[in-house]
A protein has these predicted regions:
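Active-site entrance/lid segments in N-terminal catalytic domains of soluble metabolic enzymes
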Residues: 1-181
Length: 181
């Protein structure tokens, strides 16, 4: 078996093995922490991530608001708490090895607010943000605000060209890579 050579990803030498960041709690702090602990890049989903109580039990996402707006605000709070929770779990499991990324969907509701909330609450725990599902123009600016690398997911060279011209060229030093799907 031939050994893998490391690559510089999100500011560190790691194995070129990257967890994809599957959504809705499939890729979580445990899976991403394990990938990072093995020397690769772990990616947890920041979409509706689970949060836990003091006993380690999942906190059910129950909405008590009487209006759509109130329930939306509850959803945002759950998303931020869950993302921070998964980042902490991943960071603890990684033990300082590898890199940790968060994956979000640009077109989900309140993406920017949720991103800021998670990244503010998980400072120093996350090294990069992967983002697709739309044209994530502001992912570069938001990631740069927190000193993080960003990895847009694009569907074509034309889409990337538009993103580059409109936003990414201003933050090219933190563009960690581009995911094509």
């Amino acid at each position: 078996v031939k050994s893998l050579s490391s690559l510089r990803i999100s500011g560190a030498e790691v194995l070129p093995i990257v967890e994809g960041g599957k959504g809705i709690s499939v890729s979580n702090g445990e899976s991403s922490g394990a990938w990072a602990a093995a020397g690769g890049v772990g990616t947890f989903s920041g979409v509706n991530a689970d949060s836990y109580d003091e006993n380690g039990n999942i906190i059910p996402q129950i909405y008590y608001g009487k209006t759509r707006r109130q329930r939306h605000e509850e959803l945002i709070a759950y998303a931020i708490r869950g993302g921070i929770s998964q980042a902490r779990i991943a960071h603890d499991m990684a033990g300082g090895r590898g890199r940790l990324h968060m994956n979000v969907l640009w077109e989900m509701a309140a993406t920017e607010q949720i991103l800021h909330g998670i990244l503010e609450g998980a400072k120093g725990l996350i090294h990069g943000v992967t983002c697709g599902a739309g044209m994530p123009y502001r992912i570069a600016e938001i990631s740069a605000h927190y000193g993080l690398y960003y990895y847009p997911i694009v569907s074509s060279a034309r889409a990337f060209s538009a993103l580059w011209k409109r936003a990414y060229q201003k933050f090219s030093d933190l563009l960690g890579g581009v995911v094509y799907e």
